[in-house]
């Protein structure tokens, strides 16, 4: 009886609650919202850059996926940030993140032995460049039934290619004295059909760069890139890159046409870069350092992204500014102000170190709009862009608050 009473009372209350209504009076329009208030916000999260907007088709191209988070140390399956006071709570942080070194090393890569005898390992030896210290070493005792041992990259959920399109290939190889063969680069469909290939001769023992334009004979969103070695011996592979020839506005190291055009069609007044929490970083050393995103992408060290993967920084500061110019949007640059993400380690720099951060902001402004008579404006001009970029806004920090921020 008590239950029946409460149910009846509840139903009565439900009936008595007035239903909300929304009235729109078209005769009294409010103030017009300026177009300058509508923009878009880029952040390297959920592979929105690497694997989407940025046109690179090869994942883990420099074999650096396993490199520890800057400012952290590895111990027993975790990377640990240094204990330091959190800039909001003042309590010592104990931030850590799980880290499977061996799994991360081989992200997107595998070795097809084809019934041969071979092994592979990510190593730190015979460095190609300080920014890409690791490479893939392949030790071949005997080639298999196909006559090759194949290093395969599966891209970001596949290497998508279209019939008749061209793709810019770039990779580096060095060999041991024993290795007398060559290397064949292939784009292979998900049902093992060769869609494009090019054979190269490895002529010296030091690092050798190989480039080619591959034209595909078929369409497959799940294709792979394969580097096929045809003799016994040891070879090292580093920085493997495959780009569609047709990028947005045909920019080198550019953006996917389809994704970039969707953003352009929004007609944003501004673009915010490089993002939100990644600006701060999990630690202060893990923050985005815009100067490390310039130049040849092979020389960009990249960084672990606190959204749990390593980013190439291929869509760097220059590419961001160029994209803004290409779609007639103003640029909003978000800069670190000496604070890491409050919800990760939350460490911060001493006030005496702030001049370094202030100078970094000034240098970023100079790179974008300097007249070329100053250091960073001159670097922009050397990079092939003589006119200033449309940088209009500089945002100091991301979602920061509290006494130390102010």
Question: What residue ranges belong to the model's regions?
Answer:
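Solvent-exposed loop/turn segments at secondary-structure junctions
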Residues: 46-47, 276-280, 337-341, 398-403
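Hydrophobic beta-strand scaffold residues
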Residues: 331-335
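Short linear capping/connector segments at secondary-structure termini
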Residues: 338-339, 346, 380-382
């Amino acid at each position: 009886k008590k239950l029946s009473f409460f149910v009846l009372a509840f139903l009565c209350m439900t009936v008595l609650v007035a239903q909300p209504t929304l009235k729109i009076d078209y005769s009294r329009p409010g103030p017009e919202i300026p177009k300058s208030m509508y923009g878009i916000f880029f952040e390297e999260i959920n592979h929105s850059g690497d694997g989407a907007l940025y046109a690179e088709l090869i994942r883990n191209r420099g074999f650096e996926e396993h490199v520890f988070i800057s400012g952290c140390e590895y111990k027993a399956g975790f990377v640990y940030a240094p204990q330091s006071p959190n800039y909001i709570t003042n309590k010592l942080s104990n931030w850590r993140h799980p880290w499977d070194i061996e799994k991360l090393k081989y992200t997107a890569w595998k070795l097809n032995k084809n019934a041969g005898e071979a092994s592979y390992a990510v190593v730190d030896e015979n460095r190609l460049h300080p920014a890409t210290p690791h490479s893939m070493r392949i030790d071949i005792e005997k080639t298999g039934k196909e006559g090759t041992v194949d290093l395969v990259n599966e891209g970001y959920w596949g290497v998508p290619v279209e019939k008749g399109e061209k793709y810019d290939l770039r990779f580096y190889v060095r060999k041991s004295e024993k290795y007398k063969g060559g290397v064949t680069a292939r784009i292979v469909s998900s049902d093992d059909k060769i869609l494009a290939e090019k054979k190269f001769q490895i002529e010296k023992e030091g690092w050798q760069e190989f480039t080619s334009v591959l034209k595909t004979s078929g369409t497959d969103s799940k294709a792979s890139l394969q580097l096929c070695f045809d003799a016994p011996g040891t070879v090292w592979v580093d920085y493997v890159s495959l780009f569609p020839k047709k990028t947005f506005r045909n920019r080198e190291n550019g953006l996917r046409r389809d994704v970039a055009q969707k953003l352009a069609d929004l007609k944003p007044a501004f673009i915010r870069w490089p993002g939100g929490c990644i600006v701060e970083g999990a630690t202060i050393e893990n923050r985005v350092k815009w100067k490390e995103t310039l130049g040849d992408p092979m020389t960009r060290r990249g960084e672990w992204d606190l959204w749990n993967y390593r980013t190439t920084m291929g869509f760097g500061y220059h590419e961001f500014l160029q994209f803004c110019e290409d779609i007639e949007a103003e640029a909003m640059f978000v800069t670190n102000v000496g604070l890491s993400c409050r919800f990760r380690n939350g460490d911060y720099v001493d006030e005496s170190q702030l001049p370094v951060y202030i100078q970094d902001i000034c240098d970023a402004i100079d790179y974008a709009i300097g007249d070329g008579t100053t250091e960073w404006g001159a670097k922009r001009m050397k990079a092939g862009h003589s006119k200033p970029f449309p940088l209009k806004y500089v945002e100091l920090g991301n979602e920061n608050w509290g006494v130390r921020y102010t």
